[in-house]
């Protein structure tokens, strides 16, 4: 099953000084042949975080972050997933599971993965609580860290 990499996992893969860089690389090396995806939201988030000096000590300019993103998505087995999810429509999102503003983007990225018949790969265990029925977290969320 193709895995949609969330922003945190993309950042961990790209930045050698990230605390989970080795773990992310190990997971990626073992799993990328099954296919891996990005979407508009994860690509934009990657550029935003990669060019934010408050988040990353070696942040780059947006232009440099875009160049890095292009190199990453140029790696083998990548697919780009369109995002046609309307959060207002409620497709693939169980609003009863949303309890805070920080869950909105996670739920949206999870919804994109479900729309495309895939799963989400993340460093964030909290995403498992957002999985809507009839799916199971074990089926559609891959938490890369132990």
Describe the residue ranges of each PLM region.
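Short, well-structured N-terminal submotif of metal-dependent ribonuclease cores
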Residues: 1-38, 50-64, 132-135, 146
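A generic structural signal for well-ordered alpha-helical segments
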Residues: 31, 72-73, 113
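Amphipathic coiled-coil/heptad-repeat helices and related helical stalk/stem segments
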Residues: 24, 105-106
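Acidic, PIN/NYN-like endoribonuclease modules and their adjacent C-terminal/linker elements
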Residues: 86-99, 110-146
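Acidic catalytic patch
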Residues: 16, 37-44, 66-98
């Amino acid at each position: 099953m193709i895995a949609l990499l969330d922003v945190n996992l993309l950042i961990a893969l790209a930045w050698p000084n990230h605390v989970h860089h080795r773990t992310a690389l190990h997971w990626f090396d073992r799993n990328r042949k099954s296919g891996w995806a990005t979407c508009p939201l994860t690509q934009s988030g990657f550029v935003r975080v990669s060019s934010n000096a408050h988040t990353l000590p070696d942040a780059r300019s947006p232009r440099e972050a875009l160049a890095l993103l292009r190199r990453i998505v140029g790696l083998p087995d990548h697919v780009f997933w369109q995002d046609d999810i309307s959060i207002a429509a409620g497709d693939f999102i169980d609003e009863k599971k949303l309890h805070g503003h920080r869950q909105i983007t996670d739920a949206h990225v999870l919804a994109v993965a479900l729309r495309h018949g895939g799963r989400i790969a993340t460093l964030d265990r909290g995403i498992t609580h957002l999985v809507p029925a009839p799916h199971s977290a074990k089926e559609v969320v891959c938490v890369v860290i132990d």
